[in-house]
């Protein structure tokens, strides 16, 4: 029988909230008896926006804004039914995007 694996990808703009969420997931999975690999930090995605400061002219005067998206990857190997139930009931902050693949 093939091993089951749950892959969880977390994305957030704030790395502190992201790390807290990853710690909650890892602690919950370990408490229920699953094997964990991670959290693995993935490359930070950086989006840069350049805008002209004035509304009409002075094109040489520009301002740059950036948005950083931090990512983490957690693999849960051989999850028990108890692990899946406890992960479904877990409350995480609203600024974290979660992608789960079975």
Swiss-Prot record:
Keywords: Ribonucleoprotein, Ribosomal protein
Recorded family membership: Belongs to the universal ribosomal protein uS10 family.
Protein name: Small ribosomal subunit protein uS10
GO biological process, one term: translation
Pfam families xrefs: Ribosomal_S10 (PF00338)
A GO CC term assigned to this protein in UniProt: ribosome
SS bond list: none
Superkingdom of origin: Bacteria
GO molecular function (one): tRNA binding
Subunit description: Part of the 30S ribosomal subunit.
SUPFAM superfamilies with a match to the protein in the record: Ribosomal protein S10
Function: Involved in the binding of tRNA to the ribosomes.
């Amino acid at each position: 029988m093939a091993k089951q694996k749950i892959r969880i990808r977390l994305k957030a703009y704030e790395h502190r909230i992201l790390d807290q969420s990853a710690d909650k997931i890892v602690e919950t999975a370990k408490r229920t008896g699953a094997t964990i690999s991670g959290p693995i930090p993935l490359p930070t995605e950086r989006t840069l926006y350049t805008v002209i400061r004035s509304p009409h002219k002075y094109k040489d005067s520009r301002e740059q804004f950036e948005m950083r998206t931090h990512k983490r990857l957690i693999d849960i190997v051989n999850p028990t039914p108890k692990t899946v139930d406890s992960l479904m009931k877990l409350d995480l902050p609203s600024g974290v995007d979660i992608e789960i693949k079975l």
